[in-house]
From Swiss-Prot:
Keyword Cytoplasm on entry: no
Superkingdom to which the source organism belongs: Eukaryota
Compartments in which it is found: Secreted
Family indicated by similarity: Belongs to the tachykinin family.
Protein's recorded name: Substance P
GO cellular component, one term: synapse
Modified residues (Methionine amide): 11
Chain's role: Tachykinins are active peptides which excite neurons, evoke behavioral responses, are potent vasodilators and secretagogues, and contract (directly or indirectly) many smooth muscles.
Family annotation (InterPro entries): Tachy_Neuro_lke_CS (IPR013055), Tachykinin_dom (IPR008215)
GO terms for biological process, alphabetical: chemical synaptic transmission; neuropeptide signaling pathway; tachykinin receptor signaling pathway
Keywords assigned by UniProt, alphabetized: Amidation, Neuropeptide, Neurotransmitter, Secreted
Length: 11
C-alpha cells in the first residue's frame, strides 16, 4: 500500500 509521503505527493 502507498506510503503517507506518497499520499501528500498526490494532493
Amino acid at each position: 500500500r502507498p506510503r503517507p509521503q506518497q499520499f501528500f505527493g498526490l494532493m
